[in-house]
Amino acid sequence: MNSNRCQTNEVNKFISSTEKGPFTGRDNTLSFNKIGSRLNSPPILKDKIELKFLQHSEDLNQSRSYVNIRPRTLEDQSYKFEAPNLNDNETSWAKDFRYNFPKNVEPPIENQIANLNINNGLRTSQTDFPLGFYSQKNFNIASFPVVDHQIFKTTGLEHPINSHIDSLINAEFSELEASSLEEDVHTEEENSGTSLEDEETAMKGLASDIIEFCDNNSANKDVKERLNSSKFMGLMGSISDGSIVLKKDNGTERNLQKHVGFCFQNSGNWAGLEFHDVEDRIA
């Protein structure tokens, strides 16, 4: 029995296949469906770390990575808030809302601040370069100053002054200088003459006042005689009567300094000691 069951008879297999009828493919549909279901079914994961990783990736795929912000247009920026139109049939609540509408609603911040554009700010922030890096789009090396270390040689005058013209100029300057000196000398002499005459008149008046004071205030005859016999009173008397006058010494070859002193009008001799210069040094 057992041996017969284990043996395979090819004839029996052929007969059994013919009894079933022609092949329609329905027998294999179930097997194909089973294979497809196995392929579509999620794999059996025994590792917990791998399971968490796949779950996290699914969450990332489902969530949006960025928010699409609709850019603002000129219509949005120029939009003005307006209250609803007045209606006779509106309720008291609508009337109160219309009255308090400007107080309850505030305009957007871009309408309050002039020259504010949020889109420009976002665009510029995206195009900014990192710290320390700059765009080289308009870079031009010719715009930088170039230091020239060349040493220039000094050259002489291309057209030197003619020596003949130089000599004529020097001669003209020397002539002008000499004429100016002569004018200064004449002016000094004129001024000295007038001042000398004024000083002589003042000296005569002073000498007369001294003599008059001594004569009137000397009660003692002995004192009066001593004053009259002194050289000082004799000089004051000669100055007051005009016998001694002031004279200017023009100097000599040995002594070029000029002096003003008393001299006798008739003889022209100096009254008193001769003038001597004192040197500014110690012997």
UniProtKB/Swiss-Prot annotation:
GO terms for biological process: protein import into peroxisome matrix. Keywords: Cytoplasm, Membrane, Peroxisome, Ubl conjugation. Its main location: cytoplasm. Residues 179-201 are annotated as: Disordered. The keyword Cytoplasm applies. It is found in: Cytoplasm; Peroxisome membrane. Pfam families: PEX18_PEX21_C. Disulfide bonds: none annotated. One of its GO terms (cellular component) is cargo receptor complex. The keyword Transcription regulation does not apply. InterPro entries: PEX18_PEX21_C. Ubiquitinated in a UBC4/UBC5 dependent manner. It is a peripheral membrane protein. Residues 180-200 have a biased composition (Acidic residues). Interacts with PEX7; The interaction with PEX7 stabilizes PEX18. Interacts with PEX13. Involved in peroxisome biogenesis and the import of peroxisomal matrix proteins that contain the peroxisomal targeting sequence PTS2. Required for peroxisomal targeting of PEX7 and growth on oleate. This is Peroxisomal membrane protein PEX18. The lineage of its organism: Eukaryota, Fungi, Dikarya, Ascomycota, Saccharomycotina.
